[in-house]
Each structure stands twice: as C-alpha cells, then as structure tokens.
Amino acid sequence: MRELAGSPGTWSGLSLRVGQLVFAAASVCATASALGFAAYTAFCYLIASMGLQALWSLGLACLDCYALKFKKDLHSAVLLSLFVVGDWVTAILSFAASCSAAGVVVLFDRDIYACRNPQLPCGRFELAIACAFLSWAFSATSALVMFWLLASL
C-alpha cells in the first residue's frame, strides 16, 4: 500500500492531529472567555463541536504516538473505517459550527451594528471562528487522506 502524507501512525498524521487539537482548543478558549457567549446558540454549538473535535484529535494523536513509538501499523480496514467515519463526522460538525457562528458575527457586525457595543466581544468571537475554521481545515485534510487510504485497500 502506498504511504500518504497524513496517514495514521506517521509523523505527518500526528502533525495533522496536533493541528486539529491546538486550533480546536484555542477556539473553545476564545469563545468561553468571551462574556455573554451562552446567550447565542451558535456559539454554544461552536464550543460543543470544537470540544468534540479536540477530544477526537487528542485520542488519535495519542494513538499516533503509540504507533510511532512501538512501530505499529494502523492501516487495517477496521481502523481506517473507524477513522474515516470519525473524521468525516467531526469535520462536518466543525464546518457547520464555524459557519453558523460566522453568520452570527456577520449579522452582528454588518447588519445590526452590535459590534459597536463594547460589551459584545466580537473580536474574541472572530478569533474563535478563525481557529475553528483552521481546525476544520486540518480535519477535512485528515478525512480526505483516511478516505483515500480506505479506498486503496
């Protein structure tokens, strides 16, 4: 089987997982530190989605570390099927949450001019959304690699 960049059990796969984890955690921290985020469903959904993304990425990063340390092969059909489903689910949830939160911020900023109010931390929301989109980009890349590997078995 051909070795792809981002395959499970490789350094590039570990770097994809760490990127997902770091940006998902940064998104959660930025959103949770913004006062009043709980009043808006899109930001609650963003925290839930990025929390799930962080947990999934942490688990697979640990699995990649284990595989690298003990030189294990993670290219079995069962494992790749699990990775494909998990990556696609988290990627779709991350994208939906990022888009919905971005839509709310665009509404606040461009339509009702609520970001002029200093009590609404639009800058933190924008930072959280940017981190969420970056986490989604890593997740979508990983999902495509896993799907490609599964298809090549």
UniProtKB/Swiss-Prot annotation:
Cross-referenced InterPro entries = CASP_dom, CASPL-5
Where does it reside? Answer: Cell membrane
Question: Does the keyword field hold Disulfide bond?
Answer: no
Q: How does it sit in the membrane?
A: Multi-pass membrane protein
Task: Give Gene Ontology CC terms.
Answer: membrane; plasma membrane
User: Which residues does the entry place in the Extracellular compartment?
Assistant: 42, 98-128
Any Pfam family from its record, for instance, is CASP_dom
UniProt keyword terms in alphabetical order:
Cell membrane, Membrane, Transmembrane, Transmembrane helix
Ranges of the Cytoplasmic topological domain: 1-20, 64-76, 150-153
Transmembrane ranges? 21-41, 43-63, 77-97, 129-149
The text of the family note is:
Belongs to the Casparian strip membrane proteins (CASP) family.
Q: How does it assemble?
A: Homodimer and heterodimers.
What name is this protein filed under? CASP-like protein 5B1
The species this protein belongs to is: Oryza sativa subsp. japonica (Rice)
